[in-house]
Amino acid sequence: MTPKLLENPLRIGLRQDKVPEPQILVIFGATGDLTQRKLVPAIYEMHLERRLPPELTIVGVARRDWSDDYFREHLRQGVEQFGGGIQAEEVWNTFAQGLFFAPGNIDDPQFYQTLRDRLANLDELRGTRGNRTFYLSVAPRFFGEAAKQLGAAGMLADPAKTRLVVEKPFGRDLSSAQVLNAILQNVCRESQIYRIDHYLGKETVQNLLVFRFANAIFEPLWNRQYIDHVQITVAETVGLEGRAGYYETAGALRDMVQNHLMQLFSLTAMEPPNSLGADGIRNEKVKVVQATRLADIDDLSLSAVRGQYKAGWMNGRSVPAYRDEEGADPQSFTPTYVAMKLLVDNWRWQGVPFYLRTGKRMPKKVTEIAIQFKTVPHLMFQSATQKVNSPNVLVLRIQPNEGVSLRFEVKTPGSSQRTRSVDMDFRYDTAFGSPTQEAYSRLLVDCMLGDQTLFTRADEVEASWRVVTPLLESWDDPRQAAGISFYEAGTWEPAEAEQLINRDGRRWRRL
């Protein structure tokens, strides 16, 4: 098979996308899983597709005393195991010439002086013109320290040439998020800060804005007059996966709801932006989150449910309870499941509930946004399968099988006027003949191009934390620990989560 880099783009009809300027990508925490499993495989894939400058240079930073050659071999294994493979040895060799390693401690000022000098030398060697992207793929407690040290060493001084990428979580509550934002904004401008949430790199998430605002048939229906409610689901089949140290201090509310689910929510509920520029879109996301609240502040049990998985069965094998996982507290009350009901106080959404849920050890891995429309005001037809007609449902599938489906009623064959529900289905891989790209691919290119559209702004982070703050304050209180519910691994949710939506006369979608 001909490697992508060696193909003639004119012959295969490719449009050449804008390529970032030559630059150095400095990855802090480069020996971690994210770099080997996600970042570098995505970068190499883009290298094959000619979407990155040939001068692109990657410098890995970590405490381990690795050589450049060892680092290159480590990343090669990642591309082979987690990416699309090397494809052509000469292509990999060219790419690997731009991979370097810089051992050092994140809190050592002298290391940053050494790093600055080495980057300057690489500018001369590789022709990267002083352009820098610093990617903080480290434990959250090191975000502030790394930013301070980079600022003190003068490596963030040029807003036109330097960028700082921060992985989630952005704080662990409103107060810590404000502190982190203050530190970041003290050493560089907001225009240099890229708070990355990989969900925003997924095709269906990006397509949500196009779907809403480029199709005249949907946006006029996108309001309280036609929509009954919205369900947003992020279900995972995995357990802790060796992350007990982090997860014990986070839980599902901090790990998933405040970032991933709130991002999906804001894109679904936002008003049309005045432009497709970064701030045009982000301004509207902030506005809708600021107008959002829990359904009942006085009685939080009517707004949200937390759960933790017990021992159960997944794919025919027994799996342990959360408390029995390696590294977990045997008496832990950390939630692995959250369901919540949000309301938006504006004209478009007044009275329309948004139900959000996420959990670990669910029966299947699925992420979707389901828009359920109101039923017809007068029923003239009889359903062939049930007493009432099913409502129309528009589903945006984020993963797996990214795509969009619309459920509607049709007449069954024969002389009767009975109806049944059918789905009109669109899938990216079928329609475009190839699977969607890795989420990090789009985000990394956008960052290098200086496009902040798919990255979270400081005020949006703080607005999201404000929405969930009442739950954090209650659930973090040891006196409220007994309020957690339990569900068996391999099942969808605790009974209390069913009650949360059933008391409104609705039910969770079957997935």
Swiss-Prot record:
Q: Which UniProt keywords apply?
A: Carbohydrate metabolism, Glucose metabolism, NADP, Oxidoreductase
Residues bound to NADP(+) are 63, 168
Q: Which EC number(s) does the record attach to this protein? A: 1.1.1.49
The cross-references to InterPro entries, in alphabetical order and at most eight, read: G6P_DH, G6P_DH_AS, G6P_DH_C, G6P_DH_NAD-bd, NAD(P)-bd_dom_sf
Q: Which residues form the active site?
A: 260
Q: Which residue pairs form cystines in this protein?
A: none
GO CC terms, sorted:
cytosol
Q: Which domain of life is it from?
A: Bacteria
This protein's pathway reads: Carbohydrate degradation; pentose phosphate pathway; D-ribulose 5-phosphate from D-glucose 6-phosphate (oxidative stage): step 1/3
Task: Tell me the GO BP annotations in alphabetical order.
Answer: glucose metabolic process; pentose-phosphate shunt, oxidative branch
Q: Which family does it belong to?
A: Belongs to the glucose-6-phosphate dehydrogenase family.
**What is the official name of this protein in its record?**
Glucose-6-phosphate 1-dehydrogenase
Species lineage: Bacteria, Bacillati, Cyanobacteriota, Cyanophyceae, Synechococcales
